[in-house]
Amino acid sequence: MVTKESIEVIAQSIGLSTLSPDVSAALAPDVEYRVREVMQVYHQLQLYFCPLISSLTCRRNLQEAIKCMRHARRTTLMAHDVDSALHFRNLEPTSGSKSMRFKRAPENRDLYFFDDKDVELKNVIEAPLPNAPPDASVFLHWLAIDGIQPSIPQNSPLQAISDLKRSEYKDDGLAARQVLSKDLQIYFDKVTEWALTQSGSTLFRQALASLEIDPGLHPLVPFFTSFIAEEIVKNMDNYPILLALMRLARSLLHNPHVHIEPYLHQLMPSIITCLIAKRLGRRSSDNHWDLRNFTASTVASTCKRFGHVYHNLLPRVTRSLLHTFLDPTKALPQHYGAIQGMVALGLNMVRFLVLPNLGPYLLLLLPEMGLEKQKEEAKRHGAWLVYGALMVAAGRCLYERLKTSETLLSPPTSSVWKTNGKLTSPRQSKRKASSDNLTHQPPLKKIAVGGIIQMSSTQMQMRGTTTVPQQSHTDADARHHNSPSTIAPKTSAAAGTDVDNYLFPLFEYFGESMLMFTPTHELSFFL
């Protein structure tokens, strides 16, 4: 195993160049004996501590390493060949081992040395000093913002999903199954199932309560909004499902912990649909009026909460409601939804949008309330509900104006009492007087984002023979300066005349019913 030449080479490597051949021949058997003793002890320890490792395994590893060496077209076995062999056999490679490149001495073929690179001392002295290691410090950065990891150097990029992993999809094909946890998937499936099949159950009510307060539901917001938008389109003739979807949308909008602003553009059209749609539900017994009332309050709360984030949200909603209210071709349930929506948005909407158009609208509504011209009971019932909504809206506006007005009331030019206590159509003289008053009233107010609301020919016919006077530039500029992002109110000079303009026409339209909305102090004026 150990020859005398090997002893001579080892002696020369440690500086013993005068070793005689006799000494080398005597040392070789002794070194070989001691190496065998060490190998025997190592073999015994290996069998004692690692009985699973045998010489056959070592031989196979060596064979694999030789294969790696030959594939690399080399004749020298290196450390990374052994590492590759262990890797191929699914074993942990060794660490700390490195192959060194030795050069053969030209004078002696059996002598090898490591070729170190010569370095000039001058270059070492003149080399710049390395940078001092920085002090230990802590840096803050965002791991995620609204559930989305920002692309910054501190955050490692997301690893690509392995092709070996299967993506879990349901029949609906939602790609969300890749980003939602198992708990959120089960939660979403259960809530959507209860909304479609068990909307009146206790479980669904508890789920709605959870949606209003749970702070961990932000990953589900885009999927709930998509679900609501899709199911409303599919179930326009199913009243229970529409009501359940509106309750679901309201719970999401009331949750202060979720970031729902980016999804309002997808959610608001569906909500507005449930407010001013022509038909909600299939059966005549479906109480779609309550659904419209519930949706109106949802629209108002949404505009109140997110109006400062999206400045065009309130003008766009108001414009949609006003167009529906002024369109005589729309059905009475649509008018009812538009009126309730504007009432829920605030009394200023009623004052600026509903009251100026109240007289012409009642001229078209009164025939629908009478048995003589309207034979269908359902349409008469709808007309009376619209009439009641207008009366409540006008009464609330009247009450607030009387409470805040500091001007003295001027006496009416005609009697404001109805003699028989029943709703009757105004006389022709009153119609003419009402039309004359409308010519002096301000036009529809300007919405800052939407601009002047243009009226179609059918809407102009709804006003009868009245015409809208042109606004002066001074008046329009003053209103636009006072309120840049909402419907422009009247100027302070004309604010005091609103009571005189609308008070007595309201008593003519609704009779003694307005007394319910008159404050006690102002009521003495009529007694």
UniProtKB/Swiss-Prot annotation:
Keyword Transcription in annotation: yes
CDD domains listed in its UniProt record: HFD_TAF6 (cd22931), TAF6C (cd08050)
Gene3D superfamilies membership: Histone, subunit A, TAF6, C-terminal HEAT repeat domain
Residue segments, region Disordered: 410-442, 462-492
Cited SMART domains: TAF
Start and end residues of each Histone-fold domain: 3-99
Domain of life, source organism: Eukaryota
InterPro entries: ARM-type_fold (IPR016024), Histone-fold (IPR009072), TAF6 (IPR037796), TAF6_C (IPR011442), TAF6_C_sf (IPR046344), TAF_TATA-bd_Histone-like_dom (IPR004823)
This protein's GO CC annotations: SAGA complex; SLIK (SAGA-like) complex; transcription factor TFIID complex
Expression by tissue: Expressed in roots, leaves, inflorescences and siliques.
One annotated GO molecular function: protein heterodimerization activity
Listed name of the protein: Transcription initiation factor TFIID subunit 6b
Species of origin: Arabidopsis thaliana
Gene transcribed to yield this protein: TAF6B
